From Swiss-Prot:
Keywords: Hydrolase. Residues 310-359 are annotated as: Disordered. Coiled coil: none annotated. Residues 334-351 have a biased composition (Polar residues). One of its GO terms (molecular function) is hydrolase activity. Probable serine hydrolase. The lineage of its organism: Eukaryota, Amoebozoa, Evosea, Eumycetozoa, Dictyostelia. It is an enzyme of class 3 (hydrolase). The active site is at S111. Its EC number is 3.1.-.-. Belongs to the AB hydrolase superfamily. InterPro entries: AB_hydrolase_1 (IPR000073), AB_hydrolase_fold (IPR029058), AB_hydrolase_sf (IPR050266). It comes from Dictyostelium discoideum (Social amoeba). This is Serine hydrolase-like protein DDB_G0286239. GO terms for cellular component: membrane.
Length: 359
């Protein structure tokens, strides 16, 4: 494994999972750390969403792997004959953890990623040590006629599959569209997300270079199966690990999926046994705006009730090895499973074209 010690940019890695797919990801922090964390991005976002907070956590000794969900970022799309289900993201998380040989781990998720973290923690409590939910908890729910929902999804399936991608003459045009749809996103944050979301192509009509979004267009289609709110609450009842939920002060105004959104979130929080809640200045993407407002809270949450202390960024490799040896002598090595080598990759080309790593 070729190591990139630049905590700010992270290390580009490719993770070959059991289904034969290479998942694109970014890594920060020491591989030998006892603190393992998977970072899950939101809908239509990508691993770059953690570029601001991950380096801070990594400098304190936390190993962080931020993945691109299938159909997002640099990860491949599912075949056209496959339908998309939110449960696929759950299996992706478990497949990645298995490929990394992590016996237990924590999860940090933003928006949809926080929802997936909730389900994984509820369904596999023996694997998840703690979860950090950024601006969301649980998953989207809807009181709908399931048969009609399936009918509508099937009726629109062909149209979405045959839809040609929109081509843009330059990157600025895509950025302008992003800002128009999400005016709260800061310029630097929006640009960071787009760096991993667009690719250069040749226009079939003009033969000139242009740009398109990488994400699977089916992601904007209707969902076939959506939980009812009562089912979401039953799921949240099953979460056994500590939960840190962080909200942005203005996100509720920007993220009004339902009129009674605040009441729904309050109801969900009442079903979580071990919950800590924090409100910080910022929008729905507050984790890309002002990390100093909450990074210390995450660190305290990650290290609380454990015989662990922060690892200074200046800690040498020898000191880390000595600390590792001492922990192993205590017999607390349940989470010291070393990751096998992950292949380095280049963000300028799709991960689907890269050779598979030896995991």
């Amino acid at each position: 494994m070729n190591t990139n010690n630049n905590f700010s940019n992270g290390e580009e890695v490719s993770i070959h999972i059991g289904t034969g797919i290479d998942i694109a990801a970014k890594a920060w922090g020491p591989k030998e750390s006892s603190q393992k964390m998977l970072a899950l991005h939101g809908w239509l976002d990508n691993a770059n969403t953690f570029d601001f907070i991950a380096p801070i956590l990594a400098e304190k000794g936390i190993r962080i792997i931020a993945i691109d969900f299938i159909g997002h970022g640099l990860s491949p799309h599912k075949p056209s004959w496959c339908n998309l289900y939110y449960t696929d993201y759950i299996t992706q998380v478990l497949d990645v953890a298995e490929a990394l040989q992590w016996k237990t781990f924590s999860i940090m998720g933003h928006s949809m990623g926080a929802g997936i973290a909730s389900i994984v923690a509820a369904s596999m409590p023996h694997l998840v040590e703690r979860i950090i939910c950024l601006d969301f908890i649980g998953i989207l729910s809807k009181e709908q006629d399931q048969i009609k929902a399936i009918q509508f999804a099937m009726q629109t399936r062909t149209t979405i599959n045959n839809r040609k991608p929109h081509l843009y003459n330059n990157k600025q045009a895509i950025f302008d569209k992003l800002k128009a749809n999400n005016p709260w996103i800061k310029d630097e944050a929006g640009q960071r997300l787009l760096d991993r979301s667009i690719e250069s192509v040749i226009s079939p009509t003009t033969g000139e270079q242009c740009y398109k979004l990488r994400h699977d267009p089916r992601l904007v289609g209707p969902s076939i199966f959506i939980m009812r709110e009562a089912e979401v609450l039953l799921m949240l009842d099953e979460i056994q690990c500590p939960v840190l939920l962080i909200w942005g002060t203005t996100s509720s105004q920007q993220f009004q999926i339902k009129k009674n959104w605040t009441q729904i979130m309050e109801g969900r929080m009442s079903h979580i046994k071990n919950l800590k809640q924090l409100v910080v200045p910022g929008s729905h993407h507050f984790h890309m705006e002002n990390t100093s407002a909450f990074s210390q809270d995450i660190l305290e949450f990650m290290f609380e009730e454990k015989d662990l202390s922060f690892t200074p960024s200046s800690t040498t490799q020898q000191q880390q090895q000595q600390q590792q040896s001492a922990e192993n002598k205590k017999g607390d090595n349940h989470n010291q499973i070393a990751e096998q080598d992950l292949s380095t990759s280049n963000t300028s080309s799709p991960i689907i074209s890269k050779p598979k790593p030896n995991l």
